[in-house]
Amino acid sequence: DDPALMELAASQGPVWIIDPIDGTKNFSKGKSCFAVMVAFLNQGKVQAGWIYDPIARKTCYAVAGEGAWCDGKRLTVAGAGQAIDQLQGSLGNKMGKRLGEVIDAGEHPHPVQVQRYRCCGREYMDLALGKLQFLQYAFHLKPWDHAPGVLIAREAGYFDGFFEDASHYDATQGVPDGYLMIAPDKAAWQTLRNL
């Protein structure tokens, strides 16, 4: 959270953001759920992003305005237009608790929540690959955890926005403290936000 590092991300010059071991706790415990994340920023925007799973030797990547791929295969959004109860994804503690209340009360249709991976990179990879259809993160959204993944998700066709005003994630704006949801489309995003 060093302010000087955040200023670099917002600069106009070329900046590389690298998370050499995303999912550090998993890695330190010998678990295979970790990733390497890299983002390239230039002129104040994320221009490219990569997420590498060294165990599976799989790479998801995107170039701004040109699309997203995984090992050469074009990635497209999964779950767009589907009923909310057909979607599964990862939620933070507060949203997960709220979903539990919705389920217990037998309220309206609800999505399926999966357990957090404790590795943003792998969650973003599974979103891009269609294994998950939504992700939600809250507070202290560091660019090394989100810049590559959000770009890959956007380029695959997902919608990202903060709960407060639906503004999109911007890696050059420091470390935002809001609720960020990535969903197949804006309609799903709104339904998930309103749980």
What is each residue range found by the language model?
Residues 1-4, 9:
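Non-catalytic pre-domain segments flanking phosphatase-related domains
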Residues 2, 20-23, 54, 124, ...:
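Generic detector of well-ordered alpha-helical packing
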Residues 4, 66, 167:
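Residue-level detector of flexible, active-site-proximal loop/helix-junction positions
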Residues 8-11, 81-83:
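Short, flexible hinge/linker loops that cap or flank conserved catalytic cores
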Residues 9-69:
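DPxDG-like acidic metal-binding loop motif
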Residues 47, 75-77:
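Short, isolated positions in well-ordered beta-strands
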Residues 79-195:
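An extended, acidic
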